[in-house]
Amino acid sequence: MTFQFGHLQFCIENEHILLTGAQGFPLVGQSPFCEIQIAGEIKDSHLGIKMINSSEGRKLRYVSHLLEQNTLQIVQESDLVRATTTFTMHEDGNGVQISTRVTNIFAEPLVLEEVSAFVLSGFAPVSMAGQFQLTRFTQSHHTECQPLTDSLSELGLLDTCDRRQARVAFGNVGSWSTKEALPQGILCNADSQDSLLFQIESSNSWYYEIATANGAFYLYLGGANASHGAWSKRLCCGESYDTVSVSLAFGHGLNDLLANATRHRRHIAGKCAPDAELPSIFNEYMHLSWDSPSADATRIYAPVVSRLGVKYYVIDCGWHNEEDGNVIYPYVGHWRESQKRFPLGVRETTDYIRSLGMKAGLWIEPEIIGCKCAEMLEFYDDDCFLSRHGKRICTMNRYFLDYRHPRVIEYMTEAIRRMVEDYGADYIKMDFNQDCGIGTDRDALTPGEGLESHARAYLAWIDAMRACFPQVLFETCSSGGMRMDYATLSHFSIVSTSDQTSYLRYPYIAGNVLAAALPEQAAVWSYPVGTDTPGFTPTPEWVNANISDEQIIMNMINSYLGRIHLASHLELLSEHKLELIAQGIRYYDSMIPFKKQAVPYMPLGLCRFGNALVADRKSVV
């Protein structure tokens, strides 16, 4: 028996179900699309730590499938587990979201060591290693979304023998999901241009591999596992585990592929009413207040910003502590207003911002506590923190809160309520500036399981805050783009793409970012008076002599592909230069209806740092 779900073809025979085709990819081989390794069970392989030939993969027998308009659910069973894989598609594209639930149907407890969300088996014969290319995206501070393209043969997957240990494997370990790479990639047949984009929707550890089996290539997608991320999961009889979700999109060439991926992401992205019209945002942080805002400074900056047509004015880190900005971080965590910086209270300043016709925003780092924040260290019990071997994890003078603990939920919920109802926040920027590493072994079989459970609890809390305060716009940031994954982006409507401080370098990020995030989600800094040049002097004379019209215009253009985060010493600019920014805001506003439906078009393809051109106006059709 064969049947089709969207662009996927399945075949049921001999008590097994196989995926036999996907758009542009006539699959070869006879391998399962679900792999599950149980501790103590035989892994039918001598191939090192490759994820195929798991103890349960080929033992899974077809039980049933339920095909509805947008959803396909396939149930398979071995003697030990039931695997329920769910595929979800939408009518306006070919993207598909996939996840698997594993249930222990054995009489005794089992320990899962590896569970795929999905395996695309046989996407090309090994003989095509030279013409199939993988594009992955490296990440780092100030250099997000950088593509690297290699053929599978260049990556070492050669057509030599069928029992090879070689694999191409990429992943993340820790709470910054995208600190080294995006959890996505593009597979392309260079001859036909048939292409596939895959993404793993995990806000913490994740893993994928490409290797060979039975004379063909496979793509394994999932979260952490025992070998990568120190993850295992104990299931008692009747208990279940849900994998991360993954998504696939198909296309012919880069632009068609990204268009289909963009349409799919619009169905899974976070949305909220106050962000529906993609309002422009000014944030004091970049090239301005940094981590030392004050009521007096805001009264200087805000009147100028309000004249430009900006909708939100955000006060970033520093509104909440008495310590100086350069030493503030070891002391953060109570999230109460600074009497030194805001002697009349933060509410007096946010009310002033609203009196100018803008909405007000505040910053918070809700997942950490400074290691010198005595008040909160006394309030929280030891089991409120992520820990290993009974010791709290500490990075850069910060401890990490565990959102599985009700005391953490209670205090942080009150902190958000205080920011909204007492301090007048219409916008909350939620930052996360450190990585906790492999995870926590408190109340978990392994650190990877503890990290995953905490991360899911944190996102559930985010959903609760959005439900409690639907009038508030919540932004996610992680030292720029260090957590730019679609587990996170399915809970937030806007994400910071980078902390890049140079407007001359930002185009290399902005030029690629729509391959990773929606244009209506991807926030890009625009700092017309931003400069890393030594000798910067914050006076009108210096600024107007040294900040050119071209610099202002380029800063505005940098942000047009995504969401504008305006910043810097605008109050020092001449009326002529301010009018250039106002024109830029008006043009940004004019693009909003189009942007909400637009798909990427990359006339020169993906770009790299140092390219002479990111895009060419003459190439646009």
Can you name each region flagged by the protein language model?
Residues 100, 321, 338, 351-355, ...:
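Active-site and adjacent substrate-binding regions of carbohydrate-active enzymes
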Residues 217-227:
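Short, structured beta-strand/loop micro-motifs enriched in basic residues and often containing a Trp
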Residues 181-185, 190-194, 606-621:
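Carbohydrate-binding surface patches
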Residues 1-212, 229:
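Polysaccharide-binding surfaces and accessory modules of carbohydrate-active proteins
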